Amino acid sequence: MDADTKKFYELKAEIIQAAGHPIRLAIIEFLAKGEKCVCDIVERVGAQRSNVSRHLSVMLKAGVLESRKDGLKVMYKLHTPCIVNFLACVDQALRERMQREAAVLKKLSSVSR
């Protein structure tokens, strides 16, 4: 793999890693509904403000979010709203996985009777 291709994959991985935490996923899905202030995000995810701020910083650095000041508030929104489509794909993959596992459990329970 050449250096440019490697760098491209590293940047892609950075974006995926920026979404790769349960709190960050919740923030992304919340911000899919529109711009929100930190106070609303903290309330929604139920985490400490400092913890939420750290997660927001990771996503800002990766280019997933953007922020702006509105008086004393800091407002956040998705910089790349299409990330929600990626998460919908992840949701579908999870549903399919759960269906496969449910089928295996059903088969196992019928064998053990």
Feature map (PLM): residue ranges:
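N-terminal helix-turn-helix DNA-binding core of bacterial DNA-binding proteins
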Residues: 2, 7-50, 70-83
